[in-house]
Protein backbone atom coordinates (compact mmCIF):
# COMPACT_ATOMS: atom_id res chain seq x y z
CA UNK A 1 0.00 0.00 0.00
CA UNK A 2 2.78 2.41 0.86
CA UNK A 3 4.46 1.70 -2.47
CA UNK A 4 1.23 2.40 -4.35
CA UNK A 5 0.79 5.75 -2.62
CA UNK A 6 4.41 6.74 -3.28
CA UNK A 7 4.03 5.76 -6.94
CA UNK A 8 1.04 8.09 -7.16
CA UNK A 9 2.99 11.05 -5.77
CA UNK A 10 1.90 11.00 -2.13
CA UNK A 11 4.18 11.33 0.87
CA UNK A 12 3.50 8.53 3.35
CA UNK A 13 4.49 7.62 6.87
CA UNK A 14 3.23 5.13 9.42
CA UNK A 15 1.28 6.57 12.31
CA UNK A 16 2.64 6.10 15.81
CA UNK A 17 -0.91 5.57 17.08
CA UNK A 18 -2.20 2.20 18.23
CA UNK A 19 -4.37 1.82 15.14
CA UNK A 20 -2.77 0.82 11.85
CA UNK A 21 -2.93 4.14 10.05
CA UNK A 22 -0.95 5.75 7.31
CA UNK A 23 -0.45 9.50 7.25
CA UNK A 24 -0.72 10.72 3.68
CA UNK A 25 0.04 14.16 2.31
CA UNK A 26 0.74 15.93 -0.95
CA UNK A 27 2.86 19.02 -1.33
CA UNK A 28 2.67 21.18 1.77
CA UNK A 29 -0.70 19.91 2.97
CA UNK A 30 -1.24 18.60 6.48
CA UNK A 31 -1.01 14.80 6.81
CA UNK A 32 -4.34 12.97 6.60
CA UNK A 33 -4.92 9.73 8.51
CA UNK A 34 -5.84 6.86 6.19
CA UNK A 35 -7.06 3.45 7.36
CA UNK A 36 -6.22 0.46 5.14
CA UNK A 37 -8.34 -2.71 5.03
CA UNK A 38 -7.04 -5.61 2.92
CA UNK A 39 -8.72 -8.90 1.95
CA UNK A 40 -8.24 -11.72 -0.55
CA UNK A 41 -11.99 -12.09 -0.93
CA UNK A 42 -14.80 -9.80 0.12
CA UNK A 43 -16.42 -8.65 2.34
CA UNK A 44 -14.24 -6.40 4.46
CA UNK A 45 -14.96 -6.70 8.18
CA UNK A 46 -15.04 -3.33 9.92
CA UNK A 47 -16.06 -1.84 13.25
CA UNK A 48 -19.22 0.22 13.61
CA UNK A 49 -17.03 2.94 15.21
CA UNK A 50 -15.47 3.61 11.77
CA UNK A 51 -18.74 5.25 10.77
CA UNK A 52 -19.30 7.45 13.84
CA UNK A 53 -17.70 10.42 15.58
CA UNK A 54 -14.48 11.84 14.16
CA UNK A 55 -13.80 8.61 12.20
CA UNK A 56 -16.69 9.43 9.86
CA UNK A 57 -14.51 12.01 8.07
CA UNK A 58 -11.55 9.66 7.72
CA UNK A 59 -10.60 8.03 4.41
CA UNK A 60 -10.28 4.25 4.18
CA UNK A 61 -8.58 2.38 1.37
CA UNK A 62 -10.22 -1.00 0.83
CA UNK A 63 -7.69 -3.26 -0.89
CA UNK A 64 -8.76 -6.41 -2.73
CA UNK A 65 -5.94 -8.83 -3.56
CA UNK A 66 -7.25 -11.13 -6.30
CA UNK A 67 -5.78 -14.15 -8.03
CA UNK A 68 -7.62 -15.11 -11.20
CA UNK A 69 -6.30 -17.81 -13.52
CA UNK A 70 -2.92 -17.58 -11.81
CA UNK A 71 -2.66 -13.83 -12.40
CA UNK A 72 -2.43 -11.56 -9.39
CA UNK A 73 -4.16 -8.21 -9.38
CA UNK A 74 -4.72 -5.59 -6.75
CA UNK A 75 -7.72 -3.28 -6.70
CA UNK A 76 -7.96 -0.15 -4.56
CA UNK A 77 -11.20 1.48 -3.42
CA UNK A 78 -10.58 4.88 -1.82
CA UNK A 79 -13.56 6.29 0.06
CA UNK A 80 -14.53 8.60 2.90
CA UNK A 81 -16.17 6.63 5.72
CA UNK A 82 -19.24 8.88 5.68
CA UNK A 83 -19.92 7.83 2.07
CA UNK A 84 -20.21 4.18 3.12
CA UNK A 85 -22.08 4.53 6.42
CA UNK A 86 -25.41 3.52 4.86
CA UNK A 87 -23.79 0.42 3.28
CA UNK A 88 -22.43 -0.91 6.59
CA UNK A 89 -24.13 -4.20 7.45
CA UNK A 90 -24.16 -5.69 10.92
CA UNK A 91 -25.68 -8.93 12.23
CA UNK A 92 -28.44 -8.63 14.82
CA UNK A 93 -26.04 -9.15 17.73
CA UNK A 94 -24.18 -6.94 20.14
CA UNK A 95 -20.96 -7.55 18.19
CA UNK A 96 -19.50 -4.18 17.04
CA UNK A 97 -18.11 -5.80 13.87
CA UNK A 98 -20.02 -5.62 10.59
CA UNK A 99 -19.05 -5.68 6.96
CA UNK A 100 -18.77 -3.74 3.73
CA UNK A 101 -19.32 -5.72 0.53
CA UNK A 102 -17.67 -5.29 -2.89
CA UNK A 103 -20.74 -3.76 -4.52
CA UNK A 104 -20.73 -0.95 -1.95
CA UNK A 105 -17.22 0.19 -2.89
CA UNK A 106 -17.24 -0.35 -6.69
CA UNK A 107 -17.84 3.30 -7.54
CA UNK A 108 -14.80 4.35 -5.47
CA UNK A 109 -12.22 2.26 -7.34
CA UNK A 110 -8.98 4.23 -7.85
CA UNK A 111 -10.59 7.33 -6.28
CA UNK A 112 -7.16 8.69 -5.29
CA UNK A 113 -8.13 12.35 -5.75
CA UNK A 114 -9.98 12.26 -2.43
CA UNK A 115 -6.56 12.22 -0.73
CA UNK A 116 -5.33 15.42 -2.42
What are these regions (language model features)?
Residues 1-18, 24-116:
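Mixed-charge (Asp/Glu-Lys/Arg
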Amino acid sequence: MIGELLRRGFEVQLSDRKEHLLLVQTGGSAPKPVQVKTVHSTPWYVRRASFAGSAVDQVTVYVLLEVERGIRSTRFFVVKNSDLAAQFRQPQTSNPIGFIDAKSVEQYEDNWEILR
